[in-house]
C-alpha cells in the first residue's frame, strides 16, 4: 500500500499541480456523461475526485464499480476547479483531483443510514452502528475537539508542574452518594471491589505522600439514574494540590479553561470569572448552577403580598415559606390561557402546587388573581417587579426549596422558549460558600452536599458536634451556561475534624473505622493542607461543541437505560463464570 501524501480535507490551492496519494471512504459517486465524480472522505474532510477516460480509462472502469463507503486508495493530480465549478460548501471546494489510479481496499454493505450530517435516524440505531455514526463529519469534529481539549488540559497542567499519576480502578466500596459498580473477587469469594466514583480519597493520599501537585484524566463510574448530561462512566480532569488557597486553585482552573476555550473555539475569555455565593444563586436564580446568559431573575415579593387576601400566598408565608415572582418582560402577548395552564403543569413536576400569574395591560393588573390587589397594592407590586405594560408576572408560593426548584426550572424553560439565550456565549461562574450538608428528604437526614472529606469553614468546625445543619464549607463549583462542569473544595486534613464529620453524618466510630480506617490512619502521619477540583471532560466538550447530550461526546456511550446497543452490554455470563466467582443468581426479572 502506498504511503498517503495528504489528508483529503487538507487540500487547497497551494497543492495545485502536485501529485497526491489519498486513502479514504467513498462518500458519494456520480456518473455524468462519461465522467465519474467521487467525493472521497477521510477524518479531515472531503475532496472531489474526477475520473476521466482521457487521463486513465482503467481508473474510470474501476471507479464505475465502487459504491458508497467503499475504502479506496486514489493517486492523482491536484487541479484547480473552474470558476463556475467551485463549491463554497467544501473547504477543498476550489480544487479537485484528476484521478490516475484507484485501488479498492475493501467493499461495504449498504449502510443502515446515510453517512452524512443531519441524517434523520434514531439514537438507538446510531448507537448500534456507532462505528458508522462516528464517520459522519459532525461526529468526527466533536472528537477532534475532545482531543484538543484533553491535550490543552495536559499541556497546561504539565507546564504548572503537576504530576500525572494513575490511581486504581479496582478499589474499595465506600459510601460517596451514588451506587457503586461492584466487581466480585474470584480469589476472595463473597468480597467485592468497586469501580471508583472518583479518585477522591486516593488523590488526597497522594498529597499525604508529598507529591504536592497531582492530576489525572480519569474514568469514573456511578450507578445512578441517567439523564441527558449523565452517563454511567464518564471522564474527569482531576487535580489536587497541597499548600494552596482555594483562590489559587480557582485561578489555576480559570487559566486552564481559558486556554481550552481559546484552543477549541478560538474565543478569548476574560478573567477572573464572576463569583456568586450558593445563597445568592438560589435566591436570584433558583438553581445552584445558574445560567447567567439571560435575566428573568427570581424576586421575593413575600413582604409585598403578605397582606393580600389570597389564601395561597398567605398560607405559604404563614407556614414559613415564601412567594417569589418572575417578570417576563414584554412576554404577556406570547402566552394564552392554555399556555399558562401548561406552565402550571410544568412547575408541578418540581413540587409546586400551582403557578399564579398576572399580565400588565394599560397600567393595570389583569388575570385570575388581579382582584386580590387593590390599586395601592397593585402599584406596590408593579414597583417591586419593575413591571410595565406587556409584562407577564409569574408567581410560586411554597417552601423555599420548592419555590426555588419550580421557578428555577421555569426560568430556564422561558429563557429557551422566549429566545433570550445567546447560544454563542460562554458564561462561566463560580458558586461559592456552600452549606456542608443538605437535607435528603428520602433518607430523612442530612448528607454531604459534596462529599464527606470537604473542609468546613474554620469558624464552623465546632458546630459539627452541635448544629451541623449550619456548617458552611470551603467548597466551590464552576458552572458554564447552566451546567455544573466541576466541583472542588479544600479537604479535611486533621483526623479529629474528619472524625467529627463522620459523626455528623451518622457514622459510629466503629463504622467510620471500618469504611475509612486507612484514610484516618494516613491523617495521623503529617497530611498537609490540600484541596483540588474535578472537571467533567465530557460535559465541557458537550457545551463547547454545542450539543445537548453527553452521548455525542463519548465514543461508545450507553443509552438512557445504561445499555450499549453495539455490544449488547450488560449481558448474561455463563454458569461456569458464576461458579468460579462463587456467585448465584437468586432471581431473574423477565422483561
Curated annotation (Swiss-Prot):
Biological processes annotated in GO: aspartyl-tRNA aminoacylation
Positions annotated to bind ATP: 222-224, 231, 484, 536-539
Places the protein is found: Cytoplasm
Predominant place of localization: cytoplasm
GO molecular function, one term: transferase activity
EC number: 6.1.1.12
Domain of life: Bacteria
Reactions that this protein is recorded to catalyse: tRNA(Asp) + L-aspartate + ATP = L-aspartyl-tRNA(Asp) + AMP + diphosphate
Chain segments carrying region Aspartate: 200-203
CDD domains: AspRS_core, EcAspRS_like_N
Purpose of the protein: Catalyzes the attachment of L-aspartate to tRNA(Asp) in a two-step reaction: L-aspartate is first activated by ATP to form Asp-AMP and then transferred to the acceptor end of tRNA(Asp).
Entry's family note: Belongs to the class-II aminoacyl-tRNA synthetase family. Type 1 subfamily.
NCBIfam families with a match to the protein in the record: aspS_bact, PRK00476.1
Name of this protein: Aspartate--tRNA ligase
Source organism phylogeny: Bacteria, Bacillati, Bacillota, Bacilli, Bacillales
